[in-house]
Amino acid sequence: MFNTLLVALDGGPQHDRVLDLAATMAGPRSRLHLLCVLDPEFALAAGATDADRREYPAAARQQAHAEAVLADALAELRERGVDAIAQLPCGDPGEVISAQARRLQCDLIVIGHRHLSRLQRLFEPSVGQWTIDHAPCPVLVETRDP
């Protein structure tokens, strides 16, 4: 079992499987750090007002989606008796995941797999591959289809 796990979530199709895998890897005294990384191009500043949300609807939608993903994940894990906290940072997902894992001294990172083709990877780099290459700890990738 692992004590400090970082679980990267994006609300994608593998969301439930990633959460289940992370909960399975957690021990009775483990803490899961749930992470949903916002694109900085569309992130609202801390303390954003309703006027800001109306002015930047794409940012408001992204933030609301990420907050909902984390709230649902926290509720599910707490229902299972797993200690978890959530974070909503901005930045490049791979870089943020690796930096947070280093800062938190994580024993394990749990992520999903988007099953990109080689062509898709040319235009949309793999967060998972970047994380594997730069992580300070083992990375467990959920590869099963949802």
Where on the chain are the PLM-derived regions?
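Conserved beta-strand positions in the Rossmann-like core of class I SAM-dependent methyltransferases
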Residues: 33, 85, 140
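A short acidic, glycine-rich active-site loop
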Residues: 53-68
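A conditional alpha-helix N-cap/helix-loop micro-motif detector
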Residues: 15, 66-67, 90, 121
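Structural beta-alpha unit
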Residues: 75-109, 146
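Small/aliphatic-rich secondary-structure junction motif
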Residues: 1-53
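Gly/Ser-rich helix-loop-strand patches that form or flank binding pockets
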Residues: 24, 99-146
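Phosphate- and divalent-cation-binding pockets in alpha/beta enzyme and binding domains
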Residues: 17, 96, 118
